[in-house]
Amino acid sequence: MDQLAHHYRAHIAELNRRVAEILSREALSGLVIHSGQPHRMFLDDINYPFKANPHFKAWLPVLDNPNCWLVVNGRDKPQLIFYRPVDFWHKVSDVPDMFWTEYFDIKLLTKADKVAEFLPTDIANWAYLGEHLDVAEVLGFTSRNPDAVMSYLHYHRTTKTEYELECMRRANQIAVQGHLAAKNAFYNGASEFEIQQHYLSAVGQSENEVPYGNIIALNQNAAILHYTALEHQSPAKRLSFLIDAGASYFGYASDITRTYAFEKNRFDELITAMNKAQLELIDMMRPGVRYPDLHLATHAKVAQMLLDFDLATGDAQGLVDQGITSAFFPHGLGHMLGLQVHDVGGFSHDERGTHIAAPEAHPFLRCTRILAPNQVLTMEPGLYIIDTLLNELKQDSRGQQINWQTVDELRPFGGIRIEDNVIVHQDRNENMTRELGLTD
């Protein structure tokens, strides 16, 4: 933890600086950040898995304890109100004793409904940040998730501190071990369900601890972009494997995708071509580049692949202009990554939250920012055989440019996606995923 502890001091200083600046602009006394509360299932006595408010875990790695609060004003030592009830039914979180605790004035809260006793007396001039607006109202907050504060914090969250970058490297390092285990399980005949167990065991995290529901897709299931079902039986014929899975470290996420062919064939060659294209796109990343331009460059590469692999006829630019590439590559190239998998700030032009919309022809693009140092983004081009989208091409003249025989041959394989997590530096790109061991 020495390196994290070293970086953490500067991380807290930067968060305090941001808070002080926005409080001065908005004439607020401070921010009260709520970790969140348990959500109970309807007509039940069981709670949904708890997920901490990302604004809360930006300050400290308390991820699994509801009813905690942070009181920050950018000047004084931040106060952590740590929930530690007297409870013989459930495990009670230990009093924190890690490198980060020296930066907080820690108060223990034994009853969640007594938190008002720990909050500032002039609460009306403090802003509440969190999900539970009804609780905030009862406590007397008149400013609840104010737009100006949220926009400012979201814009700056895209610029990661050295502490955050190190957490994300470790999240990648953990996920890489899971991907290697999953790949091995695939080639040894495991089912989707069994591959999932191999992955979770390798990363040492439960389904509730990884940052999102893993996509473990064999064969044609790989054509379902957000496939989260897990078949318990192995397919009669093993063709392909797409895995989109990450890991968490101190609240920060990794988000990695790989695709494998079971045998050497045309689909395997298509994976090789996509891998080459993805690395070329990453080489294009640098400060000052518009992320939508990278997305458009991806469509140009997908168009060339459609031609090279006899999936379509015509010229590459025409395939893009007619929307044919969008039927094979319907999602965005990638997104901001950090405390959340689809991290905030991807559409923010400035601190005021001016929104830069995705291009009309590419509505699913999740980032329209100009790249800058210390941003972390995913790069995840893909190519899929999705019948619902391809059927739209059949309805007009575009269908005449598709080689439906090749489509039929590739349909059982589902699709391809290759995704790395990349830090933009001033003079280079750091592909965390590959540099930490997932080279193919």
Swiss-Prot record:
Annotated residues for binding of Mn(2+) 2: 244, 255, 419
Q: Which Gene3D superfamilies match?
A: Creatinase/methionine aminopeptidase superfamily, Creatinase/prolidase N-terminal domain
Q: Which SUPFAM superfamilies is this protein grouped with?
A: Creatinase/aminopeptidase (SSF55920), Creatinase/prolidase N-terminal domain (SSF53092)
PROSITE patterns from the entry? PROLINE_PEPTIDASE
One GO biological process term is: proteolysis
As to how many cofactors bind and how, the note says:
Binds 2 manganese ions per subunit.
Q: Which residues bind Mn(2+) 1?
A: 255, 335, 380, 419
| Alphabetized GO MF terms | aminopeptidase activity; metal ion binding; metalloexopeptidase activity; phosphoric triester hydrolase activity; proline dipeptidase activity
Q: Does the keyword Protease apply?
A: yes
Query: What are the UniProt keywords, alphabetically?
Result: Dipeptidase, Hydrolase, Manganese, Metal-binding, Metalloprotease, Protease
Catalytic activity from the UniProt record: Xaa-L-Pro dipeptide + H2O = an L-alpha-amino acid + L-proline
Any one GO CC term of the record: cytosol
What is its cofactor?
Mn(2+)
> EC number(s) per UniProt?
3.4.13.9
Provide the protein name: Xaa-Pro dipeptidase
Organism encoding this protein: Shewanella baltica (strain OS185)
What gene is behind this protein?
Answer: pepQ
